[in-house]
């Protein structure tokens, strides 16, 4: 057996301690932290959407759709026309997701070529859920949808909300 000097011994024993400590704390099975719970207006809209979806499982708020949502809000506010360029930008923003639905809360105005916001934000969750029932949004009723991104914004003195839904991340 080879004799070790002090430096080799300390190096080897230090490596062994690190290996044992990692094994003891389950270093190989790291679970990422749960996503932060939504707060504020987006939380109320999410609650209304999940009421509308009952008895389907609740949707999970996903911040990865933020870049696409910024484009949707610009379109809803009339700051960006819904054209080939907008469609391309949205396509690039949702590339990491499977089956992203059409934006919820805006409709196309055939006269102007712009999208218009339709869902007014309310502190009353029941009213927002009722508005969804009146609109019968097919995207939200799909059991395959699991993720949502919600944005509220001011337009002409009124607070509106829009949402994007997706089946999953790729």
Residues of each region from the PLM?
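Short, well-ordered surface patches within globular domains
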Residues: 32-100
